[in-house]
Amino acid sequence: AVLAAMIAKADVFIQNLAPGAMARAGFGSVALRAKHPRLITVDISGYGEEGDYATMKAYDLLVQAETGLAWVTGRAEGPGRVGVSCCDIACGMNAHAAVLEALIARFITGQGKGIAVSLFDGMADWMTVPLLQFEGTGRNPPRIGLAHPSICPYGAFGTRDGQLVLISIQNEREWTSFSAHFMDEPGLPQREGFRSNNERVANRAMVDAHIAAMFASLTRDACATKLRRANTAYGFVNDCEGLRTHPALRRIAVGTPQGPVEINAPAARLSDGPRALGPVPALGAHTRAVRAEFAG
């Protein structure tokens, strides 16, 4: 009764139970929209609500595997897992965007609509480029860790002080500058095996080894100085401590029942200043108020 009363006043109803579970409980999206025409319903699933996969369990890593993401991630020795729950996150982002679109449409038409989002569809969309590459060439994109399958040099190199620096050379002008100002070898682009990107890709092991020797002779800070002088795109391969102390990281304090904690700030920056985030409620903190509001 409480849920039905809440839905009657709601703009959006989102559920991610097993396909058909809400309908069996009397809260199927089609029936809800028939009863409440302005309601926007969102059904989140692993693989959609029809077909052989509809009843499959769909944890994030399983979907990484099923969509081919795990296959193109990692090193040559075998597939790898993306280190964050990207399928879950992508699904939520797709649902959020679709809800905003539906709210705008309802403002115009006065009608709600049904939205269905699956973890599989969200990650399959992200896999468009590898899939098109396979369909165009008949070959799966190779797994090469932090390198790039069609660009060289492009990858992470170890420094004298045990750090990793990632570089990306996008064109021959950048390669010429990198050779002169970082490698201190202005004639390197004229050497056999180093002359063009195609040559460098074909001789990747030789090129990478030659570049790695220079990185290994320098500290991370010295590498950064020379890379900036060469105007080469680079980044540090940070661990979590590196992220925690990163100068670009924005953090905010949020209240919890155990006291304030710092978390990473939401990505979007608003022109009228940072948004105010309320405290995280304790489990059941609002149960009595919600029941009182919708009980009768």
Cite the ranges covered by each PLM segment:
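Flexible, small-/acidic-enriched active-site or ligand-binding loops
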Residues: V254-G296
